[in-house]
Amino acid sequence: MIGDAMNQQASIRALAGKLGMSRQNFYKGRTARRKAEVEAELVEQLVRGERALQPRLGGRKLFKILVPVLENEGIRLGRDRFFDVLREKGLLVPPLPKSPGTTRFEPSLPVFHNLVAGLELTGPDQAWAADITYIRTDEGFLYLSLLTDMWSRKIVGFHVGESLETQGALFALAMALASLRGEARPVHHSDRGCQYASHQYVGKLKEAGLQISMTEELHCYENAMAERVNGILKQEYYLGSCFRKKKQAKAAVKEAVYLYNTRRPHKSLGYETPEKMHRAAA
């Protein structure tokens, strides 16, 4: 044992000599390398743990979530090093292709002017963005109706239906209306889809005292926030996958909306979550 230790010391002295450094500095370097390895292992474990909840959460948002945890362990890691670890461990998220839309325009139905273009929002419940997207299952398509607060980014209403009929959008609207506080009456913004232009839906908006706003062109750019939320749910929470059962898809939607609202930080919100921003402004 003593001989082995002496041989190891001799080997270290020889290696340090070849590298042009003292044995003490060699040990420091080895300790630093081991420290970096341990830090990388911890980052990997934390990222995989968060990705178990939010499978496609991007690197910047992961960094914002995990920095306090790392600092609590005495680890100060810059963003560049954090991304290096993600790259080394194969944890960067590749982009997914965009999905086709679900907008159906009916020329005989009423249309409204775009009231949110250039609108300066100062708090929640001032404007909502509405949209419908589809969910694939082996049992057929489902259709997800969403209403998102345009200031806090919180999903305030949602419903998964079996068809593109207006009823699904009405259920999401009812949920959103139930969340309103006090006398707040947001502008309701959507595309020109027949669900939102239907007499039944427009009547419900007017009955609730909401102003009606629509895109003035048949493209997604004037309803970019709603499209963005659709993309996040499909790409980061795998709602763009094909589910075996409709029941599974509905459960996945419910979980995705909860995680999006309560755990996903947004750059536009100073890396706070929609739920926190919405509640803090109450």
Roles of regions detected by a PLM:
Residues I2-Q24, K89:
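Structured, non-catalytic alpha/beta "coupling" segments that mediate domain-domain communication
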Residues K206-L210, I232-A282:
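C-terminal domain-tail junction helix/linker
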Residues R23-G123, T273-A282:
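Basic, flexible linker segments flanking DNA-binding modules
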Residues A117-V156, E162-L164:
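An active-site-proximal beta-strand-loop segment
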Residues M1-A10, E44-A52:
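Short, amphipathic alpha-helical "recognition" segments used to contact nucleic acids or chromatin
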Residues T103-F105, S190-R192, S198-Y201, M214-K234, ...:
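RNase H-like two-metal-ion nuclease catalytic core shared by retroviral integrases
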Residues L15-A16, F26, V47, L62, ...:
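Mobile genetic element proteins and their domesticated derivatives, centered on retroelements
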Residues G140, F158-G182, A197:
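Active-site beta-loop-alpha junctions of metal-dependent nucleic acid enzymes
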